[in-house]
Amino acid sequence: MLNINQVNINLGRKPLLKNISLDIRSGEVTALLGPNGAGKSSLLKALCQSLKTESGEISFYQQPLGQWPKAELARCLAVLPQSSSLSFGFTVEEVVALGLYPLTISQQAGKALVASQLARLDLSPLANQAYPSLSGGEKQRVHLARVLTQLAQAPRAPLLLLDEPTSALDLAQQHKVLTLARELAHSQGYGVIVVLHDLNQAARYADNIVVINNGEIVKQGSPQQVLTKDTLSQVWHYDAQFIHTQDSAMPLIV
C-alpha cells in the first residue's frame, strides 16, 4: 500500500527525519511510538505532503505520492491531526458533511453516510449543536467522523493517519476510537497509522509498532518484538515492569 524509502527531511539545517524506510500494508494498524519531538508527527506531515522530503521517495499504491491528482488522493488518504485550529460556524452535522466533497455519490446517499458516521462515534445527539460549543474531546470525534466520511468514498482500500487521536478523550471513548481503527483495518482493509504515547494501547490495538527516536527508526516489528525492557530503557530511559495477565497476550507495562 505505502512504501517509504530512505526519506530524509530537514527543517532549515536541522534534520527532522533521517533515512526513514517503512512499508505500510492494508489491513493492519501500525503504531508510531517515541519520545516527544522524536519525529512521529513530522512523518505524518510528510505523508500529507505538508513537509517536503529532501531525498528518498514515498509511494502510495506504487505511484509516487507527488504524482497523485489531489482530488483522487484526498479520497484515499486522510489525516486526523492532533489538534485543529479551524473554527467552524457550522453545526456538527455540517462539519462532518465537509468530508463528502468532492461529492461522488448522490445527495441522499451522502446524507445517509454522514448520519452513519455520526452514530458510529456517538455524535448523533449532537448533530444540530453548534461546533464551537463542543468540548475538546467532542471536537476530536467530530473531525474523525469527517475524515471517515471522506475515506468512505475511496475507490480502493484507503490509508488513515491518526495523530494522537485519543489525547482529549475519556477512557471509554479512547477504547471506542482505537477499536474502530482496528476494525477498519481488519474488516475493511484500511491501512492505519496511529501516533500514540500510551505503550499499553499500542500493545493492545496495533499489529505493528515503529519506534522513532531523534528522527530515526530504532526498532520495528510486532508488539512482542518491540516492547521489550531493553527498548524501553534505551529509548525512554524507563525501567519498566511487566505484569502478565491471563486475558492478554501482551503483559501490562507499568
From Swiss-Prot:
One of its GO terms (cellular component) is plasma membrane. PROSITE patterns: ABC_TRANSPORTER_2, HMUV. Its main location: membrane. Residues 2-239 form the ABC transporter domain. It is found in: Cell inner membrane. Its EC number is 7.6.2.-. Keywords: ATP-binding, Cell inner membrane, Cell membrane, Membrane, Nucleotide-binding, Translocase, Transport. ATP binds at residues 34-41. GO terms for molecular function: ATP binding; ATP hydrolysis activity. It comes from the Bacteria. The complex is composed of two ATP-binding proteins (HmuV), two transmembrane proteins (HmuU) and a solute-binding protein (HmuT). Part of the ABC transporter complex HmuTUV involved in hemin import. Responsible for energy coupling to the transport system. This is Hemin import ATP-binding protein HmuV. It comes from Shewanella denitrificans (strain OS217 / ATCC BAA-1090 / DSM 15013). The lineage of its organism: Bacteria, Pseudomonadati, Pseudomonadota, Gammaproteobacteria, Alteromonadales. The gene is hmuV.
